[in-house]
């Protein structure tokens, strides 16, 4: 079904590269856009979509590739306008995150407990991110997090994709974390 399409947009930083190769083998006329061109991530591919700045770069890559493929000036102008609309929205989101982070830092409430290191991009917005990511979690960090929940310094955990680990479930149960 996808091999009959005219255009395939994919993230070249994930396993979609294999899918893309298979599609090209079935459809030599398939136009390809790798949205991740020039981008990288540290903690997980999802941070590309969660961070307003990275999201904007993904959109810019799509816009630039589309403009290479398009012949109609009207459609090129439409693509440019839609990109500008999105850029404005994402710039506002970026500014809002910066404002929230700055205010939280001034109040001393900028610590965020998260389930996954993918949220570490929030450190760019003055948040102190404490992660329960199983791949990097140490016993000392876990004990510190538990102690802060016990003292009611923390009360919430941001959880990615409903990935409730045993540690997260235990903290929720023991300290009534949200």
Give, region by region, the residue ranges found by the protein language model.
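Extracytoplasmic metal-acquisition and chelation regions
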Residues: 1-178
């Amino acid at each position: 079904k996808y091999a009959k399409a005219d255009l395939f947009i994919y993230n070249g930083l994930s396993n979609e590269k294999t899918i893309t190769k298979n599609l090209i083998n079935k459809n030599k006329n398939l136009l390809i856009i790798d949205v991740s061109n020039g981008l990288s991530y540290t903690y997980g591919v999802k941070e590309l979509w969660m961070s307003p700045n990275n999201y904007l770069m993904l959109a810019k890559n799509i816009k630039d590739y589309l403009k290479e493929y398009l012949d109609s000036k009207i459609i090129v102008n439409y693509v440019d306008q839609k990109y500008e609309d999105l850029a404005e929205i994402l710039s506002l989101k970026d500014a809002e995150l910066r404002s929230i982070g700055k205010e939280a830092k001034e109040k001393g409430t900028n610590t965020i407990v998260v389930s996954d290191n993918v949220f570490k991009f929030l450190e760019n917005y003055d948040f102190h991110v404490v992660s329960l990511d199983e791949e990097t979690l140490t016993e000392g960090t876990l004990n510190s997090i538990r102690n802060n929940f016990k003292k009611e310094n923390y009360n919430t955990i941001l959880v990615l994709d409903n990935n409730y680990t045993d540690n997260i479930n235990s903290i929720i149960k023991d300290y009534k974390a949200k």
